[in-house]
């Protein structure tokens, strides 16, 4: 459907190329310039102890968000709290009110460098995520004008309401943009594209919400809005990178502004701003 590397995930030019896979498994560090995310080959390389660093953004974005030890400390501090949490609640003045049970899946800690065997990361980054327990995502998420759809790389202009039930998006309501999103997801002919995937929030102060609008759609994959400090980032589709069984090819990332995110009773994001030790 698209040349965007994240518009169809799981199968890559490396798929079925055993000689290349074995060579990469024997390597200490793999710089991924083609996006192996969600592929069986990536899992195999990581399980062999290889380190993978995904690097696909334009040079000026890489320079602006060159990872630092401070990024790592910030992500790991928030991760320790998320790891102990049992629930995540997200609300917004636009009408979002959703809950997710936690604990079944690991934490995704993205701080931009790979400092131990078997670790995957993405430069640039600076955010934290996990996956909701299977079947537990409930409520509704209301995308407001200015929120972003990826890989479409579009700022929406009118509200889109996603109704969550038992871990899936059961209905998508709104105007043309809601219809466009629904049509795109349905084109994969796979009910698993509507499953809730990772959920979390951005921690990177050097990421900027407005930057994506200055790039051609194929020049960037949109790491600025994914990592932007204080966003709520949620997604649909596969969870195989977390040890789950969903291997669908459609993965939608949706960074949102102006949300309040709570883990258990602690507010980590208030109206789109990081709070306390997370700021």
Predicted regions, residues:
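Dual-mode signal for accessory low-complexity, basic/Gly-rich regions
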Residues: 155, 171-236
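Short, acidic Gly/Pro/Ser/Thr-rich loop/turn segments
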Residues: 107, 148-150, 179, 206-208, ...
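Internal helix-turn-beta structural module
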Residues: 219-270
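Active-site bordering "gate/hinge" segments
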Residues: 1-161, 165, 190, 260-279
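Active-site proximal loops enriched in glycine and acidic residues that flank catalytic Cys/His/Asp
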Residues: 143-145, 164-166, 173-176, 203, ...
